[in-house]
Amino acid sequence: MAASPVLAVDNSSVAADQLKSIIERIERLEEEKAGLAGDIKDVYAEAKANGFDTKVLRKIISIRKRDHEERQEEEAILELYMQALGMA
């Protein structure tokens, strides 16, 4: 038995409304993300103006995001490789 045309229109209308809502939410979040990226850029500029090395700041932030054990393992491997190359 085929679905009635009214039911098909209602389902497609609901799907269209959901899709529109999802797209609008993503667009709003993308705008917020762009605003936050601008704020972060401003903080780095402030740090640089105060004499801080922004490359080092970015590295520290990257390190702080990682798990302590994962970071220790990577540092141990780095030390091993540097010793193998006569750099340590």
Swiss-Prot record:
Highest taxon listed in the record's lineage: Bacteria
GO terms for MF: DNA binding
Gene3D superfamilies named in the record: Winged helix-like DNA-binding domain superfamily/Winged helix DNA-binding domain (1.10.10.10)
InterPro entries linked to this entry: GapR-like, GapR-like_DNA-bd, WH-like_DNA-bd_sf
Family label: Belongs to the UPF0335 family.
Protein name per its UniProtKB record: UPF0335 protein Mnod_5968
Species, as recorded: Methylobacterium nodulans (strain LMG 21967 / CNCM I-2342 / ORS 2060)
